[in-house]
């Protein structure tokens, strides 16, 4: 009942006014969008070489190396991002993709690998030295960037304990709503159930979806091997609640979601 109520009240419209929210109905279309078209051509950029020695910055705009389907190789997109960061002097002139890139978070995640060709509004970027001027340029000039966050991805968001202050990333520009889709081993009508987590990333610590997926597989195997089919469970320090949602789908009658934040 709880899960049905959540899905019933969920709309496909994000607070930004766009269709950022992933639902059971639009998930298949978003998964299909991850695939490149037959004309997408991969371009690999040397990660440890200064970017300004590899690409003419005068040519590097939103149309540079863009396929007719509207997608570009991820290396080209990140090169475009790095160019703007260099021009705004928040990283050195000899910056490289490996050492100076912000963390790119896919707005829609489904699989163990990041899509190599991405289209409009596909990324949320995070870097500790971003400012509003840089952020505006990134969302205005790089089509693939949907949102820009200021913060250290190595730090934990929210509250570490009950006495600590709430810590969030700062949303500087755009929208930071993201969706993670995780596969499970729960079978329903000949299909494996999937768990969809939609979140405004500035409020949450960065959690790697494959790691969460591995946790769900280990939990499933433990429950199956222990012949546990139902019961009451506590998802302590639940964060986004992936494990608790999984237990409800698995058949548990009651799950307590608990987190200090």
Residue map of PLM features:
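Hydrophobic beta-strand segments of well-ordered beta-sheets in folded domains
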Residues: 119-124, 145-149, 231-234, 254-258
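Non-catalytic accessory regions of SAM-dependent methyltransferases
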Residues: 1-118, 124-127, 163-170, 247, ...
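Non-catalytic substrate-recognition/targeting regions of SAM-dependent transferases
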Residues: 128-209
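A short mid-domain helix/strand-loop element embedded in enzyme catalytic domains
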Residues: 190-194, 198-202, 216-219, 225, ...
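Conserved SAM/SAH cofactor-binding pocket of Class I
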Residues: 217-261
């Amino acid at each position: 009942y709880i899960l049905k109520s959540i899905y019933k009240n969920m709309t496909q419209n994000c607070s930004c006014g766009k269709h950022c929210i992933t639902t059971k109905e639009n998930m298949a279309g978003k998964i299909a969008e991850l695939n490149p078209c037959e004309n997408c051509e991969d371009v690999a950029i040397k990660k440890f070489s200064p970017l300004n020695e590899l690409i003419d910055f005068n040519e590097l705009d939103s149309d540079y190396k863009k396929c007719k389907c509207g997608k570009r190789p991820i290396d080209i997109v990140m090169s475009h991002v790095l160019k703007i960061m260099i021009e705004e002097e928040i990283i050195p002139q000899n910056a490289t993709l490996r050492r100076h890139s912000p963390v790119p978070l896919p707005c829609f995640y489904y699989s163990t690998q990041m899509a190599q060709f991405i289209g409009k509004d596909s990324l949320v970027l995070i870097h500790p030295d971003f400012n509003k001027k840089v952020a505006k340029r990134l969302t205005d000039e790089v089509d693939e960037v949907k949102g820009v966050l200021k913060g250290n991805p190595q730090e934990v968001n929210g509250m570490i304990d009950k006495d600590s202050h709430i810590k969030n990333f700062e949303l500087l520009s755009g929208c930071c709503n993201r969706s993670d889709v995780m596969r499970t081993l729960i079978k329903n009508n000949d299909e494996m159930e999937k768990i969809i987590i939609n979140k405004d990333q500035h409020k949450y610590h960065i959690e790697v979806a494959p790691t969460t997926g591995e946790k769900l597989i280990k939990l499933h195997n433990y429950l199956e091997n222990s012949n546990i089919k139902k019961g009451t469970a506590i998802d302590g320090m639940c964060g986004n609640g992936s494990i608790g949602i999984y237990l409800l789908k698995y058949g548990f009658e009651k799950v307590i979601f608990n987190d200090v934040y």
